[in-house]
A protein has these predicted regions:
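Iron-sulfur-associated redox domains of electron-transfer enzymes in respiratory
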Residues: 1-77, 87, 217-507
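Conserved, function-defining core regions and hallmark residues within catalytic/recognition domains
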Residues: 123
Length: 507
C-alpha cells in the first residue's frame, strides 16, 4: 500500500512524529512517563470511535505502537502493566533492541481466515459445471442450481477458481500470510496472526500488507534523538532508494534537511555499494566455478538469511562481501573515529543486520524512510523552503551504485564491473524479487540449473525502492531513480575514488 496514504499510514505517521517530538523536547524520565500516558489521547482525540469498534480499543493499540516505536516490547495481555513499564531501559543514547523485531498486536488483529475458496452471488448456475468437473476432491455440489463448496473436502487447489467462466468463485487468503514468502505466519488458538520466528527473516512484507495495521516493527527513533541531544557526532548514511520518498526533496536539499534534525553530516550509501560491487565482482571471478558453482549477492539481509537458513548446504555460495551499509559505515569511521552512524533506508531487516555482533560496532542506529518522515514532521522541516545548494548534492558514487535500489540493479552493477576487469568474461545472471521467488531460484540453483551464474535476490518485490519502510509509489520511484542514475558523473563501480580504501575496510 506504499504510495497510498491510508488510515493505517496516518496512524503510523502520527506515532512516529509524536515519539520523535517527545524525544526532542523532553528530558526527564517522569515527563516521558506522563507523555506516554497522554499520547494515545493526543493521537486519538475526542469521545467517538473513528476506525474500530471502540475508542478505548483504538487508544490501547496506539499505546502499544508508541512502546514499539521506542524499541520497547509489547505488554502482556493478562496483566495490568503501565504504558511506561521498562522505560528506563529505553531512555539511552545507544542502540536498544530486544527481540523480536516484528510484533503482532493481538487485539488489533482481525483474525482473518487463513485461506478460503468460496462461491459468490455471481454464480450463474451454468450447465457446463466446469468447477465441479475439475475438482479433484469432489467438494463441489449444486444447491438450487448454484455451485456449493464443501469446505471439509476442499483442499484449496484453486482449479475451480480458474475454470469458472464468470469468475464467480474467489480465493481469499489472510493478507499478511499471503505476503510472507517464508510461510512464517499461522493462526493462534483464537485465529489471530502469529509469527514463527524460527522461519521469519524480518522482510516485513506482512506489515506492509496487513490492512488492519496489527503488525508493527520496533524502532530506534527515541535512542537516535537521545544521541543527537547528547551532542554526539551523528552521521546519517542514506540508501539510494531515498529518491522520490519525500515530496519536494531533491538530493541537494537532503543534507540541509538532515542538519535541521541534528545530524552532523550525511553520506550516500551508494559509496559503499560501489565497494560492495568491486568485492563481489572479484569474488565471482575468483570463485565461480573454481570453488563454488554459483554466487548469490549479499546486500539484501532478508534474502541472504533466507538462503542460508533454507539451503544450508549452499550457504557458502552466498557472497561474504560486506553490505553497502557496513562498508559505508566503516569508511566514515576511518575518517571520523568518534562518529556515530545512522543508516536510513527502506528496510526493516537492516535493523537486525545492524544488531549482529560483526556489525554492531559499525552501525549505531537504523531508521526507515517512514520513521525519518516522523522526525521531519516533529521538527516542522519544510522541504519547499530548503535551499537547493548544488554543493550539497551527492556526487561520490556511480550510476550503477545508485541502481542497487531497484531489482536487477545489484547484478547489473557486478556484471559491469567484471566487464571492466575482464572484458572477455561472460557472466550469466538470474534475478528474483520477493522471497517466494527467491526460494524457487535457490531450489533451481541447488538442482544445478544455475551453475556458473550470479544470482541476485531481493526480498521485496521491486527491490529496495519498494521496501517496507518506503513511502512513495514504487513505479514512480523507479522512474525517478533512473533519472537520478543518469545524473551520476561516474557510471561504473570501478570508477570510485574509494577503491584504494577497500583493503583497509576488511578487518
Amino acid at each position: 500500500m506504499r504510495g497510498i496514504y491510508t488510515p493505517v499510514t496516518d496512524i503510523r505517521r502520527k506515532v512516529f512524529t509524536e515519539v520523535a517530538r517527545m524525544a526532542y523536547e523532553v528530558n526527564e524520565l517522569s515527563d516521558y512517563e506522563q507523555l506516554m500516558r497522554e499520547l494515545p489521547f493526543k493521537i486519538i482525540p475526542g469521545e467517538e470511535k473513528s476506525l474500530r469498534s471502540s475508542i478505548f480499543l483504538e487508544r490501547a493499540i496506539i499505546s502499544e505502537r508508541v512502546r514499539l516505536a521506542m524499541g520497547m516490547s509489547l505488554r502482556p495481555l493478562d496483566e495490568s502493566v503501565p504504558a511506561s513499564e521498562g522505560l528506563e531501559h529505553s531512555v539511552i543514547a545507544d542502540k536498544y533492541y530486544e527481540p523480536p523485531l516484528i510484533n503482532v498486536i493481538k487485539f488489533a488483529c482481525n483474525a482473518c481466515p487463513e485461506k478460503v475458496i468460496k462461491v459468490t452471488a455471481m454464480c450463474q448456475g451454468c450447465l457446463a459445471h466446469p468447477c465441479q468437473e475439475v475438482c479433484p476432491k469432489h467438494a463441489i455440489s449444486f444447491r438450487n442450481g448454484k455451485s456449493h463448496i464443501d469446505q471439509s473436502l476442499c483442499v484449496k487447489c484453486g482449479r475451480c477458481v480458474n475454470s469458472c467462466p464468470y469468475s464467480a468463485i474467489v480465493k481469499t487468503e489472510r493478507p499478511c500470510a499471503a505476503a510472507c514468502g517464508m510461510g512464517a505466519i499461522h493462526s493462534d488458538e483464537h485465529g489471530r496472526a502469529e509469527i514463527d520466528y524460527d522461519k521469519c527473516v524480518s522482510c516485513v512484507m506482512c506489515l506492509v500488507n496487513c490492512p488492519f495495521g496489527a503488525i508493527v516493527d520496533k524502532g530506534q527513533i527515541f535512542q537516535l534523538i537521545q544521541s543527537i541531544k547528547r551532542g554526539d557526532e551523528v552521521v546519517a548514511i542514506v540508501a539510494p532508494a531515498f529518491i522520490n520518498q519525500f515530496p519536494g526533496m531533491t538530493p541537494s536539499k537532503l543534507k540541509e534537511a538532515m542538519r535541521q534534525l541534528g545530524f552532523a553530516d550525511v553520506a550516500e550509501v551508494a559509496i559503499g555499494a560501489d565497494l560492495c560491487t568491486i568485492d563481489e565482482a572479484k569474488d565471482f571471478m575468483e570463485e565461480v566455478p573454481a570453488k563454488i558453482p554459483f554466487m548469490g549477492t549479499s546486500c539484501c539481509p532478508a534474502w541472504s538469511v533466507m538462503a542460508k537458513k533454507l539451503f544450508p548446504q549452499q550457504a557458502e555460495c552466498i557472497s561474504m562481501a560486506m553490505t553497502p551499509m557496513v562498508l559505508t559505515a566503516r569508511l566514515i569511521k576511518k575518517e571520523k573515529p568518534n562518529a556515530r552512524i545512522c543508516f536510513i533506508g527502506p528496510c526493516a531487516a537492516k535493523k537486525l543486520e545492524a544488531s549482529r555482533r560483526s556489525v554492531r560496532s559499525e552501525v549505531d542506529f537504523v531508521l526507515t524512510f517512514e520513521e525519518l518522515m516522523g522526525l521531519f514532521e516533529a521538527k516542522a522541516v519544510n522541504f519547499a523552503d530548503l535551499p537547493d545548494n548544488p554543493e550539497d548534492a551527492f556526487n561520490s558514487a556511480s550510476a550503477d551504485a545508485r541502481g542497487f535500489a531497484a531489482s536487477g540493479g545489484v547484478a547489473q552493477a557486478v556484471v559491469n564491473a567484471i566487464k571492466k576487469m575482464d572484458p572477455d568474461r561472460e557472466v550469466k545472471v538470474m534475478s528474483a524479487q520477493g522471497l517466494a521467488d527467491c526460494k524457487k531460484m535457490m531450489m533451481m540453483a541447488k538442482a544445478g540449473k544455475y551453475n556458473g551464474y550470479l544470482l541476485e535476490g531481493m526480498a521485496c518485490p521491486g527491490g529496495c525502492i519498494a521496501g517496507a519502510g518506503t513511502l512513495a509509489d514504487p513505479a514512480k520511484s523507479v522512474a525517478m531513480l533512473n533519472k537520478y542514475k543518469n545524473e551520476a558523473a561516474m557510471k561504473v563501480a570501478t570508477e570510485t575514488p574509494y577503491q584504494d580504501s577497500l583493503d583497509l575496510l576488511h578487518y
